[in-house]
Each structure stands twice: as C-alpha cells, then as structure tokens.
Amino acid sequence: ATMGYEYVLIDNWWNTNIGYERMGQLIKYAQSKKVDMFLWYSSSGYWNDIEQGPTNLMDNPIARKREMKWLQSLGVKGIKVDFFGGDKQETMRLYEDILSDADDHGLMVIFHGCTIPRGWERMYPNYVGSEAVLASENMVFGQHFCDEEAFNACLHPFIRNAVGCMEFGGCFLN
C-alpha cells in the first residue's frame, strides 16, 4: 500500500504456505490497505505434472467454478493461470473456458507460461494479458538472463506488445 500498488499477486504454493483458511484474513488485511489480490493457479491437466499448487482446479469445470465462487466470496479481483500445454485445440478451449467462467464470477485473468494473445480482449472484458515473453523471473536461473534483462525489458513493449497486451512480471533481486 505504501508503494501505491493497486493489486498484488500471491504466487504459487499459497495453498500450502498460507492455506485456504488464512487466505481470507490476508485478503481482508490487504483490502483494509486498499490493495486488491490476484491468486496464482496451475492450468493443470494431464500434460502438466508440475508440483507448484494449487493444481487440478482450472482444468476441471466443476472444480474451477467452485474455486471461482470461493474467490468471489473473498473479494479476490483476479487469477493468474500458469503452465499451459502448448497451442493445441484442447488448450485453446481451456483458455476460453477459464475466461468465461472467471467473467461469470467477476474475476480478471492473467495467463502466464502461455500462448501469444488471440484477440481475447475483444470477447472477454476480464482478460488482462498474456505473458508469452522471456520474463524477469528467469534471472534466478543464471547470469546470462541478468545480463539481458535491461535489453529484454526495453524490447518487449515494442516487439511483443505489437501482438497484444502483455503480462510482464518484472523482478528486482538484491
């Protein structure tokens, strides 16, 4: 709040590190500071064997709608869905199913680890953006990524944003 952020993202493993029970308290605290929340989810599916959770919620229509109803009840403003399985038809359908269900529950959506934008902002007013870039989070993997960070951060707005809105998770490491 002190830094003027309107939204913050609670990233992967919040379901185990914070837990569902305590998430309501955290969201109320953030709202008292006039900061709204996005929560991270895995896209899951049989193609996705990642360990980061929560998993097995976004690829199942019943579980997805139940989770989105819970998010709406807490006042969460959006979700960031990560680790999609390519551009096959089934995955493209999943993107639109997530957007449609999220819109029904008043949730904004960011896609991460995903395909390039497909014009979804015209059909889904709750679509915020898609990453589809080599983002700052890669700086933890090696010096090469750190050395390229300034170049990439300047390049993405002019090259990648020509395709459509971009979600870019900038990082600062100390």
Show which residues each predicted segment covers:
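Aromatic- and carboxylate-enriched substrate-binding clefts and catalytic-loop regions
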Residues: D11-L173
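An acidic-aromatic substrate-binding cleft motif
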Residues: A1-Y7
